[in-house]
Design a protein with these regions (language model features):
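Active-site-proximal or metal-binding-adjacent scaffold patches in catalytic folds
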Residues: 1-85, 94-127
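Walker B catalytic acidic pair
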Residues: 90
Length: 127
């Protein structure tokens, strides 16, 4: 209820429809995920430099050495508790650019159930 997507025009052309849908999803992701990332960043006092939305095949997100966070537009289709965990995970990479014990300790200080959430992400392709 509330939001709907209507495709019109040359809908017989599958690639045109696919491109329109991907553009719409990316725009929606930008509208919802980037403000959420800023909010969690502020809440946890973990600043980042820049953020973008991408269509990634194998990653939910990434963080560069310049503290630029990229989020996968497909996060829109995950339950909110998993998205929040991914936001925390990527924000912790602004401190530790690896998956060291220090990194996981930092993640755990913000999200004690991170192991269970990380396991849940293995099945996230089902969403």
């Amino acid at each position: 209820p509330g939001s709907q997507l209507v495709l019109f025009g040359e809908t017989a052309h599958r690639e045109v429809c696919k491109a329109a849908l991907q553009k719409w999803i990316t725009r929606k992701a930008r509208m919802h995920l980037l403000p959420w990332l800023r909010s969690v960043s502020h809440e946890l006092h973990l600043p980042f430099e820049d953020a973008s939305i991408r269509r990634q095949k194998t990653r939910w997100g990434s963080c560069s050495a310049t503290k630029t966070i990229s989020l996968n537009c497909k996060l829109l289709f995950l339950p909110s508790h998993l998205v929040r965990y991914i936001l925390i995970h990527e924000l912790c990479h602004t401190i530790h650019l690896n998956h060291s014990r220090q990194f996981w300790s930092l993640v755990g200080s913000y999200e004690p159930d991170y192991r269970q959430l990380d396991d849940s992400l293995r099945d996230a392709r089902l969403y």
